[in-house]
Amino acid sequence: MKAILRSVSRSFYLTISFLPKPLREPVSLAYLLARATDTMADTATIRAPIRLTTLRDFARVIAGEREFNTIASPLQNFAAQQSDRHERTLIENLGECIDWLAKLGSADRNDIRSVLGTIVTGQELDLQRFGDPTVVTSLRTSAELEEYTYLVAGCVGDFWTKLGFRHIGTFASRSPEEMTKLGIEYGKGLQLINILRDRAADAAAGRRYLPAEELATAPVAQVFANWLAKAEEAITAGIDYCSSLTNWRIRFATALPALIGARTIALLRAADPVAERIKVPRKEVRRILAASGLASMSPLALRTLFQRLIAP
């Protein structure tokens, strides 16, 4: 499974390798399961109702309510539709992921089941709203967007915090309650950055995440700027989260998405709101990775790097 994890996300594999062993295993498995459900939800060559049914069935397998062999055949159909061989290999090996889940301690297993249940709920909503790519559909309200970012990403901050305090005695200088709140905001901020970054591509596929009620009363540039400001506020909560971690290795693994997110916000701020997809160049990601390794040694240095990356 290590080889599969490395193949589907080299950057995530690199950062996760820095985590202490008690955190590495449940985080790795949760990532693989979430990546698999995301792949199922996004397999456009399979009709949305079939994707929705299979996603729900697999969620029941994760929850321990259904045997894996009852959905092995539909999953093979999904695997066959993957153009990316690494995604295909992941789907083909989900039985091993479920076996791995069964071998974990009960607390970690229950937390993985809980966070995957929340993530799948968000993915189901996405399929129900945007299942037909020939029809352009928008989220209606800011509450719907806030809910979506929590379901598919904010909940991960809660999951990460529970694992940290359970396995690492001195996980953070803040209380579990404070860290949970910051962690949820961090996850929501990362997802909001993705939405703003991918807005043009999503619109071409019939998905509009910026609230229709806001677009009806303000120019798109203003709505975009407002949500970009919210993303910056949330990602700043993320760097507060990371700076509160007491172990530099955990700080490094946790902070990298915030640092790349900070640079993405700077690029989005400078771009036209209707521009094509904005992405931090690979060379720049490597520079951020190198800089974050040193900056993670000190919370102050980490904050300084973050401020430099997010600056206009």
Give the location of each predicted region.
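Catalytic cores of Mg2+-dependent Asp-rich isoprenoid enzymes
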Residues: M1-L190, L196-P312
